[in-house]
From Swiss-Prot:
Gene3D superfamilies: 6.10.250.2620. GO terms for molecular function: transcription coregulator activity. The lineage of its organism: Eukaryota, Fungi, Dikarya, Ascomycota, Pezizomycotina. GO terms for cellular component: core mediator complex; mediator complex. GO terms for biological process: regulation of transcription by RNA polymerase II. It is found in: Nucleus. This is Mediator of RNA polymerase II transcription subunit 17.
């Protein structure tokens, strides 16, 4: 341990960022070495030589030994004294700075009282009023005339320069004000012109300082109702600019095409923008039409999704609506310059049909808007915890119902005309009457519902058409009603058949029939029954002598169209009646046995006759054929 030595650890001396200022260095030299008067060159050389031979480590060790000799209590007393001195100096400096600040503030309060009051102490505010201290120059030194002349020249120059600057600023402000007035006048004139044409001008909800024009429909879907308001901006020259926001630049519309098989046979016209597209009214009309068309296609797509069971198909930008087995309607949203399909064939009739469908869907959307307005003006329903769903508009369903009903009418009318032609070719008089769309009657005037809404409301109700006619025998008739409904279940088209057959009062067809083949089979079967009942009546009503010698036919199997007669000598004959849409066939058979024979025992007819509607040959009538077959 005797070999150990003590090493003092000192902090690393860092260089100062900024050197001490010259006055501070002079003050340090005076405090350490005294005044400069006591320094000489010889004394400085001696101090330099002493510093060269001096051991700095030894000096530090002596200082450490002296410091270790001091007691701990003395060090604390010395520390407290130094701290008290520092605090006293700081308080004194703060007090002197406060006095100086109060003095300057009181002096400035004569000229700028409000600004000076903010820097005064509370004691000074209560002790001295504002502006009580002022300063002025006492006995200023005289200035020469040249200096006064220069000051006046400089002051005059500054005033002239300020006057010129003020004049330039006033002229610029005047020209700018004139330009602004002209721009504002032009802007407000165009705004008034828009208002005079019937458009609603209002403030924007989120920009209270901006005006907007309401061109949309207030009863539309909230998504499109909010888009029906555009800002009326002003350009630099004062022209009115319509800020359409999310509305596309090109005008768009719903296009309706008719496809038959794989060919497009008809296409509707999309509304084109006005020729004067630069005017503000044309832009408003274009924006209104575009928003209306977008809402129309949105509602069509929304309704088409719930009509999947009716055969309606949807794609990304296409709706396919079936009309018949070979024809369907295509709806899509396109730009105004794409309204014509390049693959479409030239067909004026189908183009008119496509335009009619396009106008119909627009009318139905407008009718839905009016219904929304009517519901909104009525008292609200009771509150419910669940939010009421927004029902889909009836746009596609009325059109589908009308086209489907019309297709069934054409089919039934064609069937009845074919049967009438066959019967008339056989000399059977018949009369048919058709009342198409009997549900669309004359409108009753009403003060509550406008006539336009009443007309549109009729097409939303189920469609009803009636076909009636007389059959062969007296008092025999039939009646067919076609009912089509796509709004409420049951959906589709149904036939309601009723017949009046005095010879067969118990025969009644099914009440609701949905298939056309069944309707065709029922109607031909009823007519065949009536023909079978008319043949025996015709034989009995013949009053001449030749007719008395004829045989009388009896109906054996009416639903099979079979009649027979049995003569006195035991001869038996059978008559077979077959009726279809294309022809009427009657055959007679000679039977060798008595009446107990089963139907169809004979293999080849003895007499037969077929009547067709389009047959150019002259054929005997049904009465003549029955008379010939009744000969003994």
């Amino acid at each position: 341990m005797s070999d150990s030595f003590t090493v003092s650890l000192r902090p690393i001396r860092e260089k100062r960022d900024r050197p001490d200022s010259l006055p501070r260095e002079i003050a340090q030299i005076n405090a350490q070495w005294g005044s400069f008067r006591e320094l000489s060159e010889a004394k400085l050389r001696e101090m330099i030589e002493e510093d060269k031979h001096k051991d700095h480590w030894e000096e530090d060790d002596e200082g450490d030994k002296e410091s270790t000799d001091l007691e701990t209590s003395e060090q604390l007393d010395q520390l407290y004294k130094r701290r008290a001195e520092i605090i006293q100096y700081a308080l004194q400096a703060h007090m002197e700075a406060s006095f100086a600040l109060d003095f300057v503030s009181l002096l400035l309060s004569k000229h700028q009282p409000r600004q000076a009051e903010t820097s005064m102490s509370p004691f000074l505010k209560s002790a001295a009023p504002l502006g009580s201290l002022n300063s002025e120059v006492v006995n200023p030194p005289p200035r020469p005339d040249s200096t006064l002349k220069d000051i006046k020249s400089v002051a005059r120059g500054w005033r002239l320069q300020n006057f010129n600057s003020a004049a330039d600023k006033l002229l610029n402000a005047g020209s700018r004000l004139e330009t602004e007035v002209n721009s504002e006048t032009k802007y407000w004139n165009e705004v008034l012109a828009v208002k005079e044409k019937g458009w609603k001008i209002c403030r924007l909800p989120r920009e209270s300082q901006a005006l907007g024009v309401q061109y949309g429909f207030l009863e539309a879907t909230p998504i499109f109702r909010d888009r029906g308001l555009a800002a009326l901006r002003r350009t630099d020259d004062g022209s009115l600019f319509l800020d359409k926001g999310l509305i596309p630049l090109k005008s768009q519309g719903v296009r309706v095409r008719v496809r038959r098989g794989d060919r497009i046979v008809g296409c509707s016209k999309v509304c084109r923008p006005p020729q004067d597209a630069e005017s503000i009214e044309s832009r408003i009309l274009q924006a209104r039409d575009t928003v209306f068309e977008e809402e129309l296609f949105y509602e069509v797509m929304r309704e088409a999704r719930i009509l999947g069971t009716q055969g309606v198909k949807t794609r990304q930008n296409l709706v396919q609506v079936p009309v018949s087995d070979e024809q369907e309607i295509l709806l899509d949203l396109v730009d105004w310059d794409q309204d014509r399909d390049p693959d479409a064939a030239d067909s004026t009739e189908q183009d008119v049909f496509a335009d009619a469908v396009a106008h119909s869907i627009r009318i139905l959307l407008t009718y839905a808007h009016r219904q929304n307005l009517r519901r909104r003006t009525q008292p609200p329903p009771p509150l419910a915890p669940k939010r009421r769903p927004v029902p889909e508009y009836h746009i596609l369903r009325p059109i589908m119902a009308y086209l489907q009903h019309k297709s069934h009418i054409q089919w039934l009318e064609s069937l009845i005309n074919d049967l009438r032609g066959v019967l008339q070719s056989a000399g059977i008089p018949c009369d048919f009457k058709a009342t198409q769309f009997s549900s669309i009657g004359t409108l009753q005037p009403s003060n509550q519902v406008p006539k336009v809404e009443a007309v549109a409301g009729v097409f939303l109700a189920p469609f009803l058409s009636t076909f009636s006619g007389n059959l062969v025998t007296p008092q025999s008739s039939f009646r067919i009603q076609i009912r089509t409904n796509l709004a409420v279940p049951p959906f589709g088209t149904f036939y309601e058949l009723s017949v009046n057959l005095p010879q067969y009062p118990d025969v009644q067809p099914p009440n609701h029939v949905g298939l056309q083949d069944e309707v065709s089979a029922i109607l031909t079967h009823v007519i065949m029954l009536d023909i079978a009942a008319a043949i025996p009546l015709q034989c009995r009503d013949t009053a001449d002598k030749e007719a008395k010698e004829r045989v009388s036919w009896d109906v054996d199997y009416p639903h099979h169209g079979e009649l027979h007669f049995l003569s006195r000598n035991g001869q038996s004959r059978k008559m077979k009646i077959s009726l279809s849409r294309q022809e009427l066939t009657i055959e007679t058979y000679q039977l060798n046995r008595m009446r107990g024979v089963t139907p169809g025992a004979a293999t080849s007819p003895t007499l037969w006759q077929t009547w067709r509607a389009d047959s150019p040959e002259t054929r005997p009538t049904l009465s003549e054929f029955v008379a010939q077959a009744s000969q003994p």
